[in-house]
Amino acid sequence: MPAGHLGTKRMGELAELAFMYRAASEGIGVARPYGDSHPYDFLVQHGRRLARVQVKSCFTTQRGYRRMGFPIIVAKHARKGVTLYSPDEIDFIAAFVAPHRAWYVIPVEALKGRKSIRLYPGGKSKRIGAFYEDYREAWQLLKEDKKEKDRQQQDDQASTKSRLSERALQR
């Protein structure tokens, strides 16, 4: 049965499965919190880096979306209506455009208060309004930064040397 006949909940679940597979393929650890009361779908880990990720998707294959962009709702539905995600709730939106098998890993700050965005995975050049092309397949954003890792190792080594020096002075 084509994905379009499954309903939005099932298609969202398919996108979440696709995210787990792709993130794990990139060497990123993926954990799903118990229940569905958290604002994020997954916690991801790479080295010491942890991030909260909300998965969104678009499965439509209707004509015109190549030109007009694929719509992705990047807000949450709550009792108060549609509300924005905040950096206190999530770190990234992982948006999946299923017809192109394209992923966009977008920091929540880059959404700049938008409730929906349009993505253009079919085009190679940036179109007017294609603000998120820099985030297409940007899995490196979920990974530990090598400079950050090296800096942390240096800090750990300095801390160890300091503790050893203090012990030597105490003797």
Regions found by a protein language model. Name each.
Residues 23, 42-44, 49-57:
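Conserved catalytic cores of phosphodiester-cleaving nucleases, focusing on short active-site segments
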Residues 92-126:
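Domain-level recognition of nuclease-like catalytic cores that cleave nucleotide substrates
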Residues 56-101:
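Catalytic cores of nucleic-acid endonucleases
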